[in-house]
C-alpha cells in the first residue's frame, strides 16, 4: 500500500511539472519562409498551375495569393496573426474555390487567426475556417 501511495504521489508531482500550454509562434519562425496551401477545413485544395501560398518577409510583411495577390503588414501577438490593412487585387478566377479563398484569407487576417507551426506545417485557424499550409521555401 505504501508503494502505491508513493507511486501516486510521485505521478502527481511529475504531472504538475508538465505544461500543456502551447508555445506561441514567434515572428522569427515565420519570417523568410513561404508556405503552400494544402487543405481548407481538412479538404485538399485544387489549383491549376499556381498553388495558393503565403510568405512572410522582413518585419512580418505578408504576401501571397489565393486567386488574387495580397500583401500587408502582419502582426503576431500571443499566437494570433492579424493584418488589418491587407491590400488585394480583385479579379474573378475560373476556379470558384480560389475565389472563395480570397474572402477567407482576407477575413482571417482582418479578424485574427490562431497560428500553429509544427515541423513543416503552418496552420491558420478561426472558429469558422482552418487553412493548412506546407513549407515550400523557394531557396534552401
Curated annotation (Swiss-Prot):
InterPro entries: DUF306_Meta_HslJ, HslJ-like_sf, Hsp_HslJ-like. The gene is hslJ. This is Heat shock protein HslJ. Keywords: Stress response. Pfam families: META. GO terms for biological process: response to heat. Gene3D superfamilies: 2.40.128.270. It comes from Escherichia coli (strain K12).
Amino acid at each position: 500500500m505504501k508503494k502505491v501511495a508513493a507511486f501516486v504521489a510521485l505521478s502527481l508531482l511529475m504531472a504538475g511539472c508538465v505544461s500543456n500550454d502551447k508555445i506561441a509562434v514567434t515572428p522569427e519562425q515565420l519570417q523568410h519562409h513561404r508556405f503552400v496551401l494544402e487543405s481548407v477545413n481538412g479538404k485538399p485544395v485544387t489549383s491549376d498551375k499556381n498553388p495558393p501560398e503565403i510568405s512572410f518577409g522582413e518585419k512580418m510583411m505578408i504576401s501571397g495569393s489565393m486567386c488574387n495577390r495580397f500583401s500587408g503588414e502582419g502582426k503576431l501577438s500571443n499566437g494570433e496573426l492579424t493584418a488589418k490593412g491587407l491590400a488585394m487585387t480583385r479579379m474573378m478566377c475560373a476556379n470558384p474555390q480560389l475565389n472563395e479563398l480570397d474572402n477567407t484569407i482576407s477575413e482571417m487576417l482582418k479578424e485574427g487567426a490562431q497560428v500553429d507551426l509544427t515541423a513543416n506545417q503552418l496552420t491558420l485557424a478561426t472558429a469558422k475556417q482552418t487553412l493548412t499550409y506546407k513549407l515550400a521555401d523557394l531557396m534552401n
